[in-house]
Regions:
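Hydrophobic, membrane-inserted alpha-helices
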Residues: 75-79, 100-109
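Alpha-helical transmembrane segments and their helix-start/interface "positive-inside/aromatic belt" motifs
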Residues: 4-19
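Juxtamembrane helix-break-helix junctions at the cytosolic face
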Residues: 73-91
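Short, Lys/Arg-enriched, Gly/Pro-containing loop segments at transmembrane-helix junctions
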Residues: 33-37, 142-147
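Membrane-helix boundary connector in multi-pass membrane proteins
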Residues: 104-123
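Membrane-water interface at the C-terminal end of transmembrane alpha helices
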Residues: 128-146
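Hydrophobic transmembrane helix segments
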Residues: 16-62
């Protein structure tokens, strides 16, 4: 498999992962995880008692966040299947920036809050990282071959 193809497939996988995360946030994620209550230093019952409408509200917030994750993943997968196939600078720059501010920042934040899911999220960064590095190496080799 060529480096360009590896970059394309890895980016597509990263897009599918984001779509899966988005679906989880929309359909399966509870309003608060045990780690959320632990982080704020209160039990779920205390939070519910102190702010009765918080759980329904945050459930909607996570639903919206999940929709954005799914859309980001869909666009990432589309980019992998179309313009990322060619060694053009703009799609590569979009992939770098969008990966940094989406799954990259999510992984960093989960390490900052010592999330139970920090290692899983770091693993979800790997396809994006493979895509970026493979693309960069392929571009450098192509540039060197052209002289």
């Amino acid at each position: 498999m060529s480096l360009r193809r590896l970059a394309q497939v890895s980016l597509g996988l990263g897009g599918l992962i984001l779509m899966g995360m988005g679906a989880y946030f929309v359909f399966l994620r509870p309003p608060l995880l045990p780690e959320d209550a632990r982080y704020v230093g209160a039990s779920l019952a205390q939070i519910q008692s102190a702010i009765p409408l918080f759980l329904p509200w945050v459930s909607r917030v996570f639903g919206v966040l999940g929709g954005y994750m799914f859309a980001t993943g869909l666009l990432t997968a589309y980019l992998a299947a179309t313009s990322f196939r060619e060694a053009k600078p703009l799609p590569s720059a979009v992939v770098v920036v969008s990966g940094l501010v989406s799954i990259g920042w999510m992984a960093v934040t989960n390490f900052l809050i010592d999330s139970d899911f920090k290692w899983l999220l770091l693993a979800f960064v790997l396809p994006w990282l493979v895509a970026v590095l493979s693309s960069l190496i392929a571009d450098m080799r192509a540039s060197k071959a052209r002289g």
